[in-house]
Amino acid sequence: MTAARAPWGWAVAGALAGVLPAIVAFAPAQWLTQRLGAATGGQVQLTEARGTIWTGSAQLVLTGGGASQDSAALPGRLEWQLRPSWNGLRLQINATCCTPQPLLAQVRVQLGQVRLALQDSRSQWPAAVLAGLGTPWNTLQPQGQLMLQTQGLEAVWSAGRMALAGRAQLDAMSMSSRLSTLRPMGSYRLELTGGEVPALALSTLQGPLQLTGSGQWVSQRLRFAGEASAAPDREAALANLLNIIGRRSGARSLITVG
C-alpha cells in the first residue's frame, strides 16, 4: 500500500511546489490590507484595494478603531511596490497627494531582529485626516499642513522591544481648529530624536497659540509634559481650545501623556 501511494505523494508535492509560488506571486492586495488593519487595531485601513501585495494601490483611511464611527480618508490613492531582496524586503510608497518623491524603506530580518530603515525623505500631509482617529482629534478638527522630514530613521524590533535611531521633524503649518475663530492659530514643530531613550520636543514657530513640551519613551511608553497658552490679546478667542487640550492652570493649559 505504501509503495502504491508513493507516486501520488510525489504528484501532490510537485503540484504544491508549482502552486504555492504562484499563490505568493499573485496574492491579492486584500491580504496586505487585512494584516495592516489587524496590526493597528483597525485605526489604519487600506480600502478599495487593487492589485497584489507586491504591486497595488488603495485608499488610506484613518479611524477611531473598534466601534468608533469616526473615519477620514487621505485624498487620492496610496500606491506601493514590495520587492524581495536577499535579506529582506524593499518597499516603495507613493501618495499622489502628499509625496513629491516616493518613500523608500528596507525591511531586514536577521538574528532574531526585524529592522525597518526609511530612506531620508520629505512629504506633506493634510492635518484634516487626523480627525478620523477619534478623540481628541474629532473634537479639535484640525486644519493645516503637516510637513514631515526624516533623516537616518530606523526602527529595530527585538525580544518584544523597539529601538529607534535617527530623527524625524514634523512641522504643522498654519494650523486652525473648529474650537477657535482664529485662522490660523499658529505653526508648530515636533522633533523626534532616536537613541537609547528616544526623545520628543514640541515648540512654536509662530502664532498666538503657544505650545511647548518635551517627552521620552521610557519602557516602551511615551511620557510627555507640555503646556499651551495664548498671546495676551488672544485669550478669549482661544479659551475653548485651551480648556479641551489640557488641564487649566490659570492662563495655561497643562498637557500630559503617560
Residue ranges: model-predicted function:
Residues 1-14, 33-39, 180-258:
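Extended terminal
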Residues 16-61:
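N-terminal amphipathic/hydrophobic interface segments
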Residues 44-139, 151:
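N-terminal beta-strand/beta-hairpin edge segment
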Residues 52, 72-74, 142, 184-186, ...:
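Residues that define the transmembrane beta-barrel architecture of outer-membrane proteins
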Residues 59-61, 81, 94, 147-149, ...:
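Residue-level recognition of well-ordered beta-strand positions that form the cores
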Residues 88-96, 113-121, 159, 163-168, ...:
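Short, well-ordered strand-loop elements centered on a beta-strand within folded domains, enriched
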Residues 100-102, 107-155, 194-201, 229-258:
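Extended amphipathic, helix-rich lipid-handling scaffolds
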Residues 156-198:
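Short helix-loop boundary/capping segments
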